[in-house]
């Protein structure tokens, strides 16, 4: 009766406190009804009515959500880093972070043209005082962006974003796919993650609403769906077939979800793949589009790694291009980001989403949802404009831009090859080639003793492996159990982002650690 009642001190009188810390609750008011108690009430009883926040009365969906990319291994890495700064000794002299796709955190240099533009948009006076510091095309782009948002980067933009940037994104999509794109369907977001989360908020209405997610998956999806009160149903990518998908498996997942009484609202498709490092074939994309058109399921096309394709002859194909060529009336939301590719501007939080084949009233509701946060950050919007509209042949910055871009992409290809080749030489390790994105995702054949030891610790065996790799070798990776995997299999995700000299260290440390670890559990 009283569990949710907040006491008003003016309506409560207490007797004297005795040694037993009891108070006599004389009167209080509840719902306009005066009640009287004459018995003593222990203070702990009074405290139970308090509104003080504890771990037990916060949103339990947040408490039970998992996000392995910044989970237990990373928390321990932060502890080690702090201990090292205080002088504590470890078997290594530095940590090698291979856990998250955050390029500039591990020494990737930013693209000069972008930084020149952002410097000017943040401090326009510097261009007046020292124009010689900047390339002419950077000066011109900054001038255009400042004019497009009155007040500059320190002022709110329109909810959907600076109109010029939305228009430039639409032109970029039209050029990429060869089909029209309406700027009214473009929404600029704080990274792709916000766009994905807000789209999920829009779609999930009831506890029985379901999103299909790939396994292995990027845990943004499972965590967000859980917190927003929906359900997810896995569809498995086939490791034996280069992490390709099978249309029959998607259809089985749809049937499985519906058999549970769930309403399948959407399917998440990540291409190129995180964590797999693989690209969907055109046939894979066609299969998803056809199924979704037939079943009235929204496609959530996570395409943030579209510039990260390494296999010779491969080229990115968007879901919008395929469904348009097939003349399918699918409902599609596609996402892109400034954080990946060769830009690596994670901290700028630039992103966009495009809604395709949604009615205007639904689009208006997404606009309202985004309006609650006013707009995405304007520096991120400017970054997006530069990313989708970089220097062109003949521009003053073009030669330097091409040199920087190709240098980054070529280096990523080399590092991907070097790391995957080294991993395949380890006993019990199988690593498919890295054809896209920023990760190797290797499979571990665990000794039975290792699996048993992990069970005794209450941990997944690949989590135990990653914790040992961190504590003994200083390499920070993410266990496959955090992405989902077929029962009885174990995986580890490592980025390919450490610079070349550190990739060599990663290879050496992992090689030495792995040999000792496997010998320990043979």
Could you tell me what each predicted segment is?
Residues 99, 438-457, 473-507:
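Conserved PLP-binding active-site segment of the aspartate aminotransferase-like
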Residues 73, 98, 169, 186, ...:
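Generic structural signal for small/hydrophobic residues in well-ordered secondary structure
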Residues 112, 118-294, 306-329, 333-334, ...:
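Conserved core of the PLP fold type I
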Residues 48-160, 171, 297, 381, ...:
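N-terminal "arm"/small-domain region of PLP-dependent enzymes with the aminotransferase-like
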Residues 88-89, 95-97, 335, 430-435, ...:
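Short beta-strand
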Residues 21-53:
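N-terminal mitochondrial targeting presequence
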Residues 49-51, 55, 113-116, 136-144, ...:
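Conserved core segment of the aminotransferase class I/II
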Residues 56, 104-107, 112, 401-413, ...:
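Conserved PLP-binding catalytic core of the aspartate aminotransferase-like
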């Amino acid at each position: 009766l009283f569990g949710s009642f907040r006491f008003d001190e003016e309506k409560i009188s207490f007797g004297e406190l005795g040694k037993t810390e009891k108070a006599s609750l004389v009167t209080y008011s509840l719902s306009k009804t005066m009640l009287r108690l004459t018995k003593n009430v222990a203070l702990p009883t009074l405290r139970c009515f308090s509104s003080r926040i504890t771990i037990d009365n916060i949103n339990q969906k947040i408490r039970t959500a998992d996000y392995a990319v910044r989970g237990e291994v990373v928390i321990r890495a932060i502890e080690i880093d702090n201990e090292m700064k205080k002088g504590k000794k470890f078997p290594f002299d530095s940590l090698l972070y291979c856990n998250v796709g955050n390029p500039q955190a591990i020494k990737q240099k930013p693209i000069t043209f972008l930084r020149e533009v952002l410097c000017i948009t943040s401090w326009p006076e510097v261009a007046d005082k020292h124009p010689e510091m900047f390339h002419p095309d950077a000066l011109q782009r900054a001038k255009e962006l400042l004019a497009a948002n009155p007040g500059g980067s320190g002022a709110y933009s329109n909810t959907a974003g600076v109109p010029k940037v939305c228009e430039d994104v639409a032109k970029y999509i039209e050029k990429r796919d060869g089909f029209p794109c309406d700027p009214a369907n473009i929404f600029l977001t704080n990274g792709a993650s916000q766009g994905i989360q807000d789209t999920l908020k829009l779609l999930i209405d009831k506890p029985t609403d379901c999103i299909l997610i790939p396994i292995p998956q990027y845990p943004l999806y499972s965590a967000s769906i859980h917190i927003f009160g929906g359900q997810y149903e896995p569809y498995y990518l086939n490791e034996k077939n280069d992490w390709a998908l099978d249309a029959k498996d998607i259809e089985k997942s749809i049937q499985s979800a519906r058999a549970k009484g769930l309403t399948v609202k959407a399917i998440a498709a990540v291409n190129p793949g995180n964590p797999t490092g693989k690209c969907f074939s055109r046939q894979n994309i066609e299969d998803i589009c056809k199924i979704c058109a037939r079943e009235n399921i929204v496609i959530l096309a996570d395409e943030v790694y579209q510039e990260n394709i390494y296999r010779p002859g491969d080229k990115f194909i968007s879901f919008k291009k395929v469904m348009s060529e097939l003349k399918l009336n699918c409902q599609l939301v596609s996402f892109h980001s400034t954080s990946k590719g060769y830009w690596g501007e994670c901290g700028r939080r630039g992103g966009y989403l495009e809604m395709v084949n949604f009615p205007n009233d639904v689009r208006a509701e997404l606009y309202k949802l985004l309006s609650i946060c006013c707009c995405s950050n304007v520096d991120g919007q400017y970054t997006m404009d530069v990313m989708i509209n970089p220097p062109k042949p003949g521009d003053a910055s073009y030669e330097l831009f091409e040199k920087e871009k190709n240098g980054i992409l070529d280096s990523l290809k080399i590092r991907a090859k070097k790391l995957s080749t080294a991993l395949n030489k380890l006993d019990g390790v199988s690593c498919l080639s890295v054809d896209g994105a920023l990760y190797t995702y290797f499979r571990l054949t665990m000794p039975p003793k290792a699996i048993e030891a992990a069970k005794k610790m209450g941990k997944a065996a690949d989590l135990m492996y990653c914790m040992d790799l961190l504590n003994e070798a200083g390499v920070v990776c993410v266990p496959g159990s955090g992405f989902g995997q077929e029962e009885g299999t174990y995986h580890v995700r490592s980025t390919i982002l450490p610079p070349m000299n550190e990739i060599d260290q990663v290879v050496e440390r992992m090689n030495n650690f792995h040999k000792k670890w496997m010998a320990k559990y043979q």
